[in-house]
Amino acid sequence: MDIRWEEILEEISKQIPPKYFSNFIAPLRFDKWENQVVHLMAPSGGIKRHVETKYIGFIEDAVYQVVGDRFKVSILTESETSSHVLKEVIQSKFDDSDSDLNPEYIFSNYITSDSNRIAFTAAKSVVEQPGKYNPLYLFGPVGVGKTHLLHSIGNEIKKKDPWKTVRYVNSTSFLNEFIFTVRQNNRESLESFKIRYQSYNVLLFDDIQFLNGGAEKTQEEFFALFNFLYDRKRQIVIASDRPSYELPLHDRLKSRFVHGLQADIKSHDLELRKSLLKSNFSEFNIPASDNLLHWLAERLEGDSRALIGIVNDLVMYKKAYEYFLLTEDKIKEIAEARFLTNKKRIGFSPDMVIDLVCERTNVARKDLLGKSRKADFIPPRHLCMLLLHDVLNVPKAQIGRIFSTTHSTVIHGIDKFKERMKSEAQWEDLFHTIKHKISFQ
């Protein structure tokens, strides 16, 4: 079958604003098709992630329009191919191909309010004086813009000084890369890994709370890398979903994070949610009055991911039906179907449930989310998992990320607590008391 990529690009261009088509779709390169999958290559991890998040459906629809058959779309970067990983690469000062920066995440489109202004100011200060606030540690719940700030720092530093080498990486990628290197059982491969990371002027490290998911050597390697960069006044920026003292990492590593600047990003307040909605609606030409934006902002949870989800739903509706059918009543209907089926629970986030369990069981948050097997901590931990899953409908995989553990451990914890409730009435009573408070908040 002939995959006519140029025609597919033309079809996609009809559906996406020119600015975004130029930045994210045009750079994609057709690689091959096999087994009903179209394989594309992206020039960077940032572009790959953005396309997978926002535009994969547009590409699959365009393939169907041109080819007349349904294909899945797979996107890889060159760095994800094994042949690239096995090379001994020490990047040139002029080569930022492995920076993994998303070019769309910049300071100018980061919307601020009281909930994130300190973190935003700290991020800009790092750009103005790299190495002065070292490390910069950003923390806050999921979906509040930590990753956006990391990329903004990197993009602005590269803009000011193209000679600087910048690397954005999350803990999962770092873990996988390190484990892959170690398994080569080759001293040269390990040295190449170390030299490459030591060569960066700026390291942007996301989701550090998951660094404990690998072998002991992974934390040791990161500790050595941190010290190497820190001693040479190279800028390090770290992001996490919790304060540094709550990280499930070695104390000697956590102690290094308090030397610099720590900035808390809180859940989005009402005005920030309105501003984000307005910006996203404008991007996709979705009509909305100020009253409608206020109505939506009041009902959405305090992070950007739920917000992006509803925008995606509206974009698909607008594409499938006529533009004029997307009335304010229809927007409300779509929003309620996706997010607002249980209005009594609006605003109750996983963080609030965790805090409530800590309060009712007199267990510190760091102990509830930690790895300790003390008898005082295990039942409250399992109670929290059950509440998150059964009452807030949080997926088990996400609960695993919250507790820095595996999907199977979450299942085991939930099952254990259900068994406990059958024989220990006080835990059953506490479960129903907290469930009632959440359900009728």
UniProtKB/Swiss-Prot annotation:
ATP binds at residues 143, 145-147. Residues 1-71 are annotated as: Domain I, interacts with DnaA modulators. The keyword Nuclease does not apply. Residues 100-318 are annotated as: Domain III, AAA+ region. One of its GO terms (cellular component) is plasma membrane. Signal peptide: none annotated. Residues 71-99 are annotated as: Domain II. It is found in: Cytoplasm. Gene3D superfamilies: 1.10.1750.10, 1.10.8.60, 3.30.300.180, P-loop containing nucleotide triphosphate hydrolases (3.40.50.300). InterPro entries: AAA+_ATPase, Chromosome_initiator_DnaA, Chromosome_initiator_DnaA-like, DnaA_C, DnaA_dom, DnaA_N_dom, DnaA_N_sf, P-loop_NTPase. One of its GO terms (molecular function) is ATP hydrolysis activity. Keywords: ATP-binding, Cytoplasm, DNA replication, DNA-binding, Lipid-binding, Nucleotide-binding. Residues 319-441 are annotated as: Domain IV, binds dsDNA. GO terms for biological process: DNA replication initiation; regulation of DNA replication. Domain I is involved in oligomerization and binding regulators, domain II is flexibile and of varying length in different bacteria, domain III forms the AAA+ region, while domain IV binds dsDNA. Plays an essential role in the initiation and regulation of chromosomal replication. ATP-DnaA binds to the origin of replication (oriC) to initiate formation of the DNA replication initiation complex once per cell cycle. Binds the DnaA box (a 9 base pair repeat at the origin) and separates the double-stranded (ds)DNA. Forms a right-handed helical filament on oriC DNA; dsDNA binds to the exterior of the filament while single-stranded (ss)DNA is stabiized in the filament's interior. PANTHER family: CHROMOSOMAL REPLICATION INITIATOR PROTEIN DNAA. This is Chromosomal replication initiator protein DnaA. It comes from Leptospira biflexa serovar Patoc (strain Patoc 1 / ATCC 23582 / Paris). The gene is dnaA.
